[in-house]
């Protein structure tokens, strides 16, 4: 729906856990999944997409800076964090001792509450020049002479000469099907699978106070797989999201200190790049996430110490944890029954590596939520 009619019943306090709405308002509508994110804006070409495949770094940075001016026009902050400071470089040197690589970036944190307000301001301006049609399902795309025809669920057909399709990650599988039908070759054989880590904010405070979000990459010794931290949220909250009926986990943080928690959360993701003949990474990721749902009815949570010992976390064991979960609807269980052994081994090794630069990361009561899955939109 439009930016004003998107309301998650969990956030509104009407229910305690996901009720599987037919359309997830957290993920779909004006602003997409970003509408309720905490608005991290990264100034870098080291990660965040593939634009550098088509233009040089200077051009990409010029576009990133342009988008920042648009964001500020609609209310974004001018405050930034950077890895290009003496304190950040000291963190980078310390991380390298343990084969952890800190990616270079300048970052702005808008905050969940401010991000929504900025998008509302954009929506008001765009309404003056664009006609929107919300809650209108496009069933199919067909060629129509030199243009295209869209078949809507209501039975209507819309014809156009030029068509821009941007269904986001929630519509990635649908988009792949449409491209296959149209004979358009796609590039996408990657999915990232992992967990969301939650621990006391003080454990990472010496890092988040300097760079806010640390993007750290580690190559595991056991398998040689790449594991990375992603979407770090100091004093944040862990949340569930619904991707086509599958509950996955995510996180966010507010700018307002009054809305903060005592914990920091971040994702640990293992990159999975598949080779021929396998070409269904999206379905693979959904299947992994569905195993967590099958075991817990939603998002699963486990203490790190229990995972290492091979013990299932239950309500009693979770109640003993000094780290209190911010996602109270998460169900205690055993991640080893849901995630593949290889990815789980990678995650455990990464946690021990992080513990060397942020002592306390590998504490028994560090909480792991699963599954977190990052889907990649297909590219032409």
Q: Where are the regions a protein language model picked out?
A:
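Mobile "lid/hinge" segments at catalytic clefts and subdomain interfaces of large enzymes
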Residues: 50, 61-64, 68, 276
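Conserved catalytic/binding loops enriched for acidic/polar residues
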Residues: 55, 65-68, 73-74
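Compact, glycine/acidic-enriched structural inserts
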Residues: 76-78
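Residues forming the flavin
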Residues: 1-55, 81, 86-380
């Amino acid at each position: 729906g439009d930016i004003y009619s998107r309301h998650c019943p969990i956030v509104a306090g009407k229910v305690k856990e996901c009720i599987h709405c037919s359309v997830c308002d957290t993920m779909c509508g004006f602003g997409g999944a970003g509408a309720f994110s905490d608005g991290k804006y990264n100034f870098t070409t080291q990660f965040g997409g593939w634009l550098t495949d088509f233009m040089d770094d200077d051009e990409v940075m010029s576009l990133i800076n342009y988008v920042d001016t648009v964001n500020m026009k609609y209310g974004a902050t001018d405050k930034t964090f950077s890895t290009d400071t003496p304190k950040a470089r000291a963190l980078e040197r310390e991380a390298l001792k343990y084969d952890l690589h800190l990616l270079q970036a300048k970052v702005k944190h808008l905050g969940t509450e401010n991000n929504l307000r900025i998008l509302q301001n954009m929506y008001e301006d765009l309404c003056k020049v664009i006609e929107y049609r919300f809650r209108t399902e496009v069933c199919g795309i067909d060629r129509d002479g030199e243009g295209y025809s869209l078949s809507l669920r209501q039975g209507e057909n819309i014809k156009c000469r030029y068509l821009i399709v941007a269904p986001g990650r929630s519509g990635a599988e649908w988009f792949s099907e449409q491209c296959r039908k149209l004979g358009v070759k796609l590039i996408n054989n990657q999915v990232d699978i992992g967990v969301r880590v939650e621990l006391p904010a003080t454990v990472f405070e010496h890092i988040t106070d300097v760079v806010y979000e640390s993007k750290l990459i580690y190559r595991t010794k056991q398998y040689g797989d790449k594991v990375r931290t992603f979407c770090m949220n100091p004093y944040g909250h862990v949340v569930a999201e619904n991707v086509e009926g599958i509950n996955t986990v995510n996180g966010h943080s507010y700018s307002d200190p009054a809305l903060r928690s005592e914990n920091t959360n971040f994702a640990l993701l293992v990159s999975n790049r598949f080779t021929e003949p396998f070409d269904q990474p999206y379905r693979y990721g959904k299947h992994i996430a569905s195993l967590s749902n099958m075991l817990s009815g939603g998002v699963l949570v486990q203490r790190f110490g229990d995972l290492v010992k091979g013990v299932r976390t239950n309500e009693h064991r979770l109640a003993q944890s000094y780290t209190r979960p911010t996602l109270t609807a998460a169900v205690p269980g055993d991640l080893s029954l849901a995630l593949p052994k290889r990815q789980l081994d990678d995650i455990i090794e990464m946690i021990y590596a992080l513990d060397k630069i942020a002592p306390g990361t590998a504490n028994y009561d560090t909480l792991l939520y699963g599954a977190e899955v990052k889907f990649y939109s297909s590219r032409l």
